Amino acid sequence: MAKNEIPRSFLNDLDAYIEKNLPKVLEKYTTETLGDRSKYIGASDIAGCLRKSFLSKKEKVEHSIAKHIIFQRGHLTEQIVELMITGTNYKKQVELCSKTYNGFDIKAHLDFVIENEKRAVVLEVKSTSTPVDEPYESWILQIQLQMGLLQKR
């Protein structure tokens, strides 16, 4: 083994630790910041695949480490956007709640809301692995629901 080489066994142990620990840490963080997502319908649930959303409420969804890292990249993007809007009158992670006509809880967690005396602007931050020319329909539906809930506030 070379002088500065890290032993393979250490790297294997570290990989195993990360694979076991990262999902637990992220699940705890999500519950602390968004609540138990199985107990309410979120704006992204309504805007996305309804079957996938329904099943995610009934059974715990397991994600690969690669998928967890992709999700975290989105959170890092939010931090960059927050730096970009510093100095404006913004609020971060604004939670809005309502109920459907048949009593289900709906919650939306708006990444950012910038307000002045005339208007409120919702910023929903998305990160993608490839450039996107037009927003996806699910993104548009999500932001429309968020704006509707914000208007009802």
Q: Locations of the language-model features?
A:
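Secondary-structure boundary elements
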Residues: 115-119, 148-153
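Short, charged, amphipathic alpha-helix that recurs within catalytic cores of restriction-modification
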Residues: 135-150
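Metal-dependent nuclease catalytic cores that hydrolyze phosphodiester bonds in DNA/RNA
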Residues: 1-122, 129-137
